[in-house]
Structures are given as C-alpha cells and as structure tokens.
UniProtKB/Swiss-Prot annotation:
Superkingdom of source: Bacteria
Localization per Swiss-Prot or TrEMBL: Cytoplasm
GO terms under biological process: protein quality control for misfolded or incompletely synthesized proteins
Binding partners and assembly: Fourteen ClpP subunits assemble into 2 heptameric rings which stack back to back to give a disk-like structure with a central cavity, resembling the structure of eukaryotic proteasomes.
Recorded catalytic activity of this chain's protein: Hydrolysis of proteins to small peptides in the presence of ATP and magnesium. alpha-casein is the usual test substrate. In the absence of ATP, only oligopeptides shorter than five residues are hydrolyzed (such as succinyl-Leu-Tyr-|-NHMec, and Leu-Tyr-Leu-|-Tyr-Trp, in which cleavage of the -Tyr-|-Leu- and -Tyr-|-Trp bonds also occurs)
HAMAP family registered for this protein in UniProt: ClpP
Function: Cleaves peptides in various proteins in a process that requires ATP hydrolysis. Has a chymotrypsin-like activity. Plays a major role in the degradation of misfolded proteins.
Record: active site: 98, 123
Protein name: ATP-dependent Clp protease proteolytic subunit 2
Keyword Secreted (UniProt): no
C-alpha cells in the first residue's frame, strides 16, 4: 500500500493540509517516481502546462527517479517541456534509466543535474511483437526508426558522436553521476 505523506501549512487564515506532491507543485517542483505510462504523462503534462500558465518566466524543476517505460508517454512529457516557455530543470535522484535518461538530458541546457549517488542508463528501445510476419516487420521498422531518433537526440544533447552512441546503446549502458556529466547527459553533479 502506498501512503502519501501530508504536510500542514500554517497561514494567517489558519491551517491547510496538502499531500506532499501538491505542496511541492506550489514550489514549481514535479516528481517522476515511477515507470513512464499514459497516466504519468497526462499528470506531468498537465502540471507543466499549469505552471507555465501561472508564471511563464519562472523555472520549473522535474525530479526523476524512474526505470523508464513507454516512449510515447515520455515523449509527450519531453515535447511539453520544450513547448512551455519557462526553462525546465531536470534532476536525477536515484535512477534515470531509458526514457528517464532521455527526459533528464532533455532539460534546459545548463540546468540538468544528478545527485552524487544517482545512476543513469541509456540503451536501445525495447519491443516485443507477436502476430503475422508483416506485423512483425512493421514493428521492427518502427523500433529501428525510434532507435535512430533516440541516437540523434542524445547526439544533439550530449555532443557524443552517433557511432559512439550506437555502440554504447547496443546494451544497457550505465553511468554514475560523474560519468553522466563527462558524457554530457547532465551539466553538474549536486
């Protein structure tokens, strides 16, 4: 059972209780602490749009602790990060793997961070398909196209050569925070 902590805020008007995530949102902090799926994407996208509408000059921070997940859900968040006017800072706490690493690298240049004991992992997209040969061929082409898209993204965000990215992403490629900084996924270790 997941228990969500509540905090109590005292004001001149009295006390008000918030679940911790709502309280963090008041400080323009969004938490991603699970696998990427459509529910997470809808929640985070709505939070980004809300914070941008509330103040389109003030940075938004996204803290990431995720094993990865759905690329379509992750790209919905990434596209919204690029769409909103405020800079979006990304901070890895724990792990940013797969789609989590893409989102981490997708933060505003100069504002991508990881805590010192964080772990970052990149790899080629995963997929499984059943069905007729034609369906499997369509799915394989889609995954290859997605892999090339991810390689281009990391090339643009890290400066790593495409050939190095192809080789590194052939299997799970793990980095600690300092290695992720040297690789160009993040800008600083906190």
């Amino acid at each position: 059972m997941n228990t969500i902590p509540y905090v109590i805020e005292k004001t001149a008007a009295g006390e008000r209780s918030y679940d911790i995530f709502s309280r963090l949102l008041k400080d323009r902090i969004i938490m991603i602490g699970s696998e990427f799926n459509d529910d997470l994407a809808n929640r985070v996208t709505a939070q980004l749009l809300f914070l941008s509408a509330e103040d389109n000059e003030k940075d938004i921070s996204i803290y990431i602790n995720s094993p990865g997940g759905s690329t379509s859900a992750g790209y919905a968040i990434l596209d919204t990060m690029d769409y909103v006017k405020p800079d979006v800072r990304t901070i890895c706490v724990g792990m940013a793997a797969s789609m989590g690493a893409i989102l981490l690298a997708g933060g505003a240049k100069g504002k991508r961070y990881a805590l010192k004991n964080s772990e970052i992992m990149i790899h080629q997209p995963l997929g499984g398909v059943k069905g007729q040969a034609t369906d499997m061929e369509i799915s394989a082409k889609r995954i290859i196209k997605l892999r090339e898209k991810i390689e281009r993204f990391f090339h643009e965000r890290t400066g790593q050569p495409i050939e190095k990215l192809k080789a590194d992403m052939e299997r799970d490629y793990f980095m600690d925070a300092d290695e992720a900084k040297a690789y160009g996924v993040i800008d600083a270790v906190l």
